[in-house]
Amino acid sequence: MIALLCLSSLFPFSFMVKHGNRKYLCTFVNMKTFVIAGCGRLAGIVSEAVIKGLLPEYELVGVYSRTVAKAERIAGRMAEAGKSCAVCTTADELLALKPDILVETASPAALREFAVPALKNGTSIVTLSIGALADDAFYREVCETAKENGTRIYIASGATGGFDVLRTAALMGKATARFYNEKGPDALKGTPVYEEALQKEQKVVFTGNAVEAIRLFPTKVNVTVAASRASVGPEAMQVTIQSTPGFKGDTQRVEIRNDQVHAVVDVYSETAEIAGWSVVNTLLNIVSPVVF
């Protein structure tokens, strides 16, 4: 038994123990540790999934936010559930925990800050801020660093999906793709395109490619870059953004065509919660024997 307990830290395995007339199946699971950078609403969904037992093969060991109170709130919830979670005040402190995975739910700027150091640290990344990967030079650096260090960067689907069919259609050749996003005018406040007239009239506020879109809306259209990286690339992905008075939530519609396939992935979400749950799904896929 002592030998088995020692081996349990190396890999998951099961064995049978007989006690009297009863037999018990004992399973040791190799737990993965992860940390979160960015402690807003989406990070809260992921941490609550841990608390509710939806991620049984994971241990959340640390959280980091530029607003320390937000990190403390998540760590406090973990403590209430009897789970230890460190509040980190710097990126170096977070990576010093040597997590298997870094979950990034902050911003493209945060991904730029964390990606290369994390991958060199032996830490794979699950990210929602895919907009940072529109930059080809940064994208290549991330890919090369991951290869050199045996790590990976997992792109969560966020508020869209269908990356498998997008990639498949693109691999077949001669593919074109376009992305359509509809949102309410309030969601555009603070951006260069916002004007009060949008509160009363429907208007296309942007047309261009995914690189131009993420440059103009650095936190609003990460999904366009994700869909483009799964298919035709950020320069070739054509993007249209429409503002509709009174519209709540987001419609994300990506369309891809080649000589044989025409596919449309159309997702409406009233809130951003689907993005947080897409991280939970990605984490499950990483450890699942069956991957969707």
Name these PLM-found stretches.
Residues I130-G150:
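Rossmann-fold NAD(P)-binding glycine/threonine-rich loop
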Residues T89-K120, A132-D136:
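Beta-loop-alpha module in the N-terminal Rossmann-like domain of NAD(P)-dependent dehydrogenases
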Residues N121-T123, E148-T151:
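A short helix->loop->beta-strand "cap" motif at the edges of active sites that frequently abuts
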Residues A37, Y154, A159-F292:
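Active-site-lining helix/loop region of Rossmann-like oxidoreductase modules
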Residues E104, T127, I153-S157:
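General beta-strand structural signal in soluble alpha/beta enzymes
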